Amino acid sequence: MALATQSNRIKIGIRPTIDGRRMGVRESLETQTIRMAQSVAQLLQTHIRHTDGTFVECVVADSTIGGVAEAAACADKFKRENVGLTITVTPCWCYGSETIDMDPHMPKAIWGFNGTERPGAVYLAAALAGHSQLGLPAFSIYGTEVQEADDTNIPEDVKEKLLRFARAGLAVASIRGKSYLSIGSVSMGIAGSIVNQAFFQEYLGMRNEYVDMMEIKRRLDRKIYDQEEVDLALSWVKQYCKEGVDVNSLENQRNAEERAELWENVVKMTIITRDLMVGNPKLATLNYAEEALGHNAIAAGFQGQRHWTDHLPNGDFMEAMLNSTYDWNGVRPPYILATENDSLNAIGMLFGHQLTGKAQIFADVRTYWSQDSVERVTGWRPESGFIHLINSGSAALDGTGEHQDAQGNPTLKPAWDVTEEEAKRCLENTRWCPAVHEYFRGGGLSSQFLTKGGIPFTIHRINLIKGLGPVLQIAEGWSIDLPQDVHNKLNQRTNETWPTTWFVPRLTGKGAFTDVYSVMANWGANHCVATHGHVGADLITLASMLRIPVCMHNVSEKNIFRPSAWNGFGQDKEGQDYRACQNFGPLYK
């Protein structure tokens, strides 16, 4: 499969700017300025990773930047080195617009050192004014506390902003130029599967690729797959994938021979879809050189319903396995594959994965359960209402919560931290239930699991609104545990063959977060992504880089980090965001 090499991975550029006056001024600042750049590079190279687990590489300009000639030389170097985002650092006054990063598509931040001997803050303000005037928004980083001139430590508040900027900026740069692959078309009239090419091109810098679902059928029939891998996968499935409850009537249940054929087909579909996304050199040895290339897809969606699933096995196994961090080839980064070709949820999954390196849970925002409703149905009264997240397809098996943190608590880990034992526990706590015949006449196998409680999650969703464009909504909260008999009653009356996460958002007492019902009532679509951790602040920063306004969130205002130019659009943070995004327009338009 096609993987980035160290030479072509996105890098972070560090730009040390300096007062250009020679004969004493510049010379006295060289050491301090270079040390700032080196300290930032050291921080990022030990904390920020690509999604395959490798630490990011930083590229520092060949010299400090005192004027436009050195700024241009730095820009040339960064192009050669595949730099995708830049951080400018300085302890002193520099020549504003002569030294700034002028690339219109590159996320950019400036750290102005808070010291008294030299006016780093003054340059920061001057450079940011230039960025705003030129329409090139940049992020402002300035420490709360005054530091000594020889202090090489990075304050904690500065670290937090540097790391947040780097995570979001790396995500922006990493998805640019990649493809979203639609396998099929619109599923059951779902708006998210009406792929909006302008959104992908102008906001994300991505291209759209399309294949008919018949391409999977062609590869099944003509054996365009690696048979050795199929054999390995079937052996692995037999050992680790346990069948679950079959709720179908007897006449719609499959016998042992039919189930074996079903397993073989869904395994082949998984391998074929992965090959469609990223290619597979093995196919070239089978005289399928074109198919071996793939579609350079960093994310994909499978329509499934109903044109495929009325006749052939659904994509539940394929979607769940590809989105997980473990399969017959061992622990690996997840692939991003959306149910029902919901391209907008796929991008939410992509955002979550890029920011965390972790597998994502794709879910329907299915039901709001009030205290009264739960008590009426089960006889048990919860402390508050909660939301049922459930969907048949793309919920990664990591969502079982069978990974463990250092204290033994349930969690979801990035692939580089997942152990074989943890991965197998996810499988052990998953059952594969025959698909409900009335919905999936072609059969299939749906993952059935229950997410452990007490895990922090952020649910989020991009929606497209005519005349406005994309908006992002975010709700941080936690998974919860219900008494087993309560879970059984609620789950069985919904769909016991699908994966369930019981979710409670963090409430603020106002607006969309007045209560749990309000969160459900304000959700903009039928699907959401559940990303492990409270990552709303990172999502807000990422959205601002792409000029996607955030319409709903419960993130503390002190954690909101957007370009400094946003401050020119009023004092109300949400309205400010809308006005700034509208003014500057999509990043790649």
From Swiss-Prot:
EC number: 5.3.1.25
Positions annotated to bind Mn(2+): 340, 364, 527
Superkingdom of this protein's organism: Bacteria
GO cellular component: cytoplasm
Subcellular location: Cytoplasm
The name this protein goes by in its record: L-fucose isomerase
PANTHER family tied to this protein: L-FUCOSE ISOMERASE
GO biological process, one term: D-arabinose catabolic process
Family membership noted in the UniProt record: Belongs to the L-fucose isomerase family.
Active site as annotated: 340, 364
Repressor among keywords: no
Catalytic activity: L-fucose = L-fuculose
Xref: HAMAP family: Fucose_iso (MF_01254)
Function: Converts the aldose L-fucose into the corresponding ketose L-fuculose.
Provenance organism: Haemophilus influenzae (strain ATCC 51907 / DSM 11121 / KW20 / Rd)
Source taxonomy: Bacteria, Pseudomonadati, Pseudomonadota, Gammaproteobacteria, Pasteurellales
Annotated Gene3D superfamilies: 3.40.50.1070, L-fucose Isomerase, Chain A, domain 2, L-fucose/L-arabinose isomerase, C-terminal
